[in-house]
Every structure is written in structure tokens, then in C-alpha cells.
């Protein structure tokens, strides 16, 4: 097994959101919030904002709403 595999996998993450666009947008927006000082909503050893955001999505600690203008 390749040790560089991302956990959770993209396949698993896509089961929790509508599509890849939503996944990327959610991850980017949440990572930006974390960089700006928001507290992590999950327990994780990593300090990397993208890793934390992905874990939050995987654990369904954050939600999203699709609006006409995009993702909120």
C-alpha cells in the first residue's frame, strides 16, 4: 500500500458532498477560516489547515448550503 495515500480517500469524501467542486470549495473556504483564526471542530494532531478542513468534512463537523451564488 502506498504510504502517500490521503486519508480519508477522495472516494470516501465524495460520499459526503454533492461533487468534486463542492468538496474543493468547502475545503478551501474552511481552510481559509482556520488560517484566519477559527478553531478546529475536530481533534487532530495536524496543524495544516487543509488537513484539518478535510477531517472536518469527513467527520461531518461542517455542513454546506448550495445557494444560487455558490456554496455558503
Curated annotation (Swiss-Prot):
<comment type="function">
    <text>Promotes RNA polymerase assembly. Latches the N- and C-terminal regions of the beta' subunit thereby facilitating its interaction with the beta and alpha subunits.</text>
</comment>
<keyword id="KW-0548">Nucleotidyltransferase</keyword>
<keyword id="KW-0240">DNA-directed RNA polymerase</keyword>
<comment type="similarity">
    <text>Belongs to the RNA polymerase subunit omega family.</text>
</comment>
<comment type="subunit">
    <text>The RNAP catalytic core consists of 2 alpha, 1 beta, 1 beta' and 1 omega subunit. When a sigma factor is associated with the core the holoenzyme is formed, which can initiate transcription.</text>
</comment>
<dbReference type="GO" id="GO:0003677">
    <property type="term" value="F:DNA binding"/>
</dbReference>
<dbReference type="InterPro" id="IPR036161">
    <property type="entry name" value="RPB6/omega-like_sf"/>
</dbReference>
<dbReference type="InterPro" id="IPR006110">
    <property type="entry name" value="Pol_omega/Rpo6/RPB6"/>
</dbReference>
<protein>
    <recommendedName>
        <fullName>DNA-directed RNA polymerase subunit omega</fullName>
        <ecNumber>2.7.7.6</ecNumber>
    </recommendedName>
</protein>
<dbReference type="GO" id="GO:0003899">
    <property type="term" value="F:DNA-directed RNA polymerase activity"/>
</dbReference>
<keyword id="KW-0808">Transferase</keyword>
<dbReference type="InterPro" id="IPR003716">
    <property type="entry name" value="DNA-dir_RNA_pol_omega"/>
</dbReference>
<keyword id="KW-0804">Transcription</keyword>
<dbReference type="Pfam" id="PF01192">
    <property type="entry name" value="RNA_pol_Rpb6"/>
</dbReference>
<dbReference type="GO" id="GO:0006351">
    <property type="term" value="P:DNA-templated transcription"/>
</dbReference>
<dbReference type="GO" id="GO:0000428">
    <property type="term" value="C:DNA-directed RNA polymerase complex"/>
</dbReference>
